[in-house]
């Protein structure tokens, strides 16, 4: 049921014209860094459709810029899978790995860092190419929030203290869904930067939060059966059932309505952007960057997520694992010696 749940997304679907080439070459990068070694891991990775996802998130990107987006999507899901199992239920083990990965934001990693950390270091190096120090600092801040969120989730599992309310869950999950770093990369892939004085404006912040919320609601629907099998309790469907005593179908219907309401608000916020440009006295180039952010970053991460979730093999029933089983085929989080 979950991947077939319909959401009305009033935004056009787009895809990079270079998607076929990127899809054919998507295993080259993770294999070169030892992130995918076995044929089984390669087959499972291909089933996820991560090149398809990147080509929808970054439809304006081609060549090396699209490849960076594909590699980021590959890395995201390889990293996330490392926490499906005992590590993700142990806050100390989780923090040890997230700290090792986040260290790449501060400088070169030691050779003994785990493969998943070296993968992130390569992505971060390429991400910062051609971007201003202020942009890199902003993106690094978003990445740190992302890594911190994994520790929060592990704490919740360790203490068997699932979120009591939708509001509590959203506050935690908004970081680990990874939308903000994903949207950041749209600027890098498109070789533009939103004016920094506008980024934290009320309108922009509200637009981005809607993009984050829609993504996590879509993801929770798609991954519901997988998480039910694992005994995961922090999923919006389950939380709504606990909080309100609703049935599964009513909880899903409520989430559909939430997405619809948020997107109506999003379109209203979009209509305010010309006024934002006036208030912040943006010049022509800055207004163009703001418009590109609207069309090539925020919109595409909303619509692209929806289209990918409906077709990705990542959420197929065969990948649903029992509680305590590890969700990855290859250990990428252990330090090399």
Curated annotation (Swiss-Prot):
For this entry, the protein name equals Pentalenene synthase
> What does the annotation give as the result of altering residue 219 to L?
Loss of activity
Impact of altering residue 77 to A? Answer: Loss of activity
Biological source species? Streptomyces exfoliatus (Streptomyces hydrogenans)
Disulphide bridges, residue numbers: 128-136
**Pathway it acts in?**
Sesquiterpene biosynthesis; pentalenene biosynthesis; pentalenene from farnesyl diphosphate: step 1/1; Antibiotic biosynthesis; pentalenolactone biosynthesis
Keyword match Hydrolase: no
Tell me, which GO biological process terms does this entry list?
Answer: antibiotic biosynthetic process
Is tRNA-binding set as a keyword in this record? Answer: no
* Impact when changing residue 81 to E: 50-fold decrease in activity. 9-fold increase in Km for FPP
Kindly, how does the activity depend on pH for this protein? Answer: Optimum pH is 8.2-8.4.
Superkingdom: Bacteria
């Amino acid at each position: 049921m979950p991947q077939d749940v319909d959401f009305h997304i009033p935004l056009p679907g787009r895809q990079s014209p270079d998607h076929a080439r990127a899809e054919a070459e998507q295993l080259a990068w993770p294999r070169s860094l030892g992130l995918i070694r076995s044929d089984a891991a390669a087959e499972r990775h291909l089933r996820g459709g991560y090149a398809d996802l990147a080509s929808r998130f970054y439809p304006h990107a081609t060549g090396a810029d699209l490849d960076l987006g594909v590699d980021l999507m590959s890395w995201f899901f390889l990293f996330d899978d490392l926490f499906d199992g005992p590590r993700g239920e142990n806050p100390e083990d989780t923090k040890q790995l997230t700290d090792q990965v986040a260290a790449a934001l501060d400088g070169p990693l030691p050779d003994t860092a785990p493969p998943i950390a070296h993968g992130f270091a390569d992505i971060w190096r390429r991400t910062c190419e051609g971007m201003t120090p202020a942009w890199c600092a902003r993106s690094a801040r978003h990445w740190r929030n992302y890594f911190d969120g994994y520790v929060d989730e592990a704490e919740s599992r360790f203490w068997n203290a699932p979120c009591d309310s939708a509001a509590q869950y959203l506050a935690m999950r908004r970081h680990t869904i990874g939308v903000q770093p994903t949207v950041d990369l749209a600027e890098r892939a498109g070789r533009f930067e939103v004016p920094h004085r506008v980024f934290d404006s009320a309108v922009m912040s509200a637009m981005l939060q809607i993009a984050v919320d829609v993504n996590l609601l879509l993801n929770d629907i798609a991954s519901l059966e997988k998480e039910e099998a694992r005994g995961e309790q922090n999923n919006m469907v389950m939380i709504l059932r606990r909080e309100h005593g609703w049935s599964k179908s009513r909880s899903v219907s409520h989430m559909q309505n939430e997405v619809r309401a948020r997107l109506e608000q999003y379109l209203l916020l979009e209509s305010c952007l010309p006024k934002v440009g006036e208030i912040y006295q943006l010049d022509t180039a800055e207004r163009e960057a703001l418009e590109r952010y609207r069309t090539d970053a925020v919109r595409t991460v909303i619509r692209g997520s929806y289209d990918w979730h409906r077709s990705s093999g990542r959420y197929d029933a065969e990948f649903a694992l029992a509680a305590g089983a590890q969700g990855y085929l290859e250990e990428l989080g252990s330090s090399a010696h």
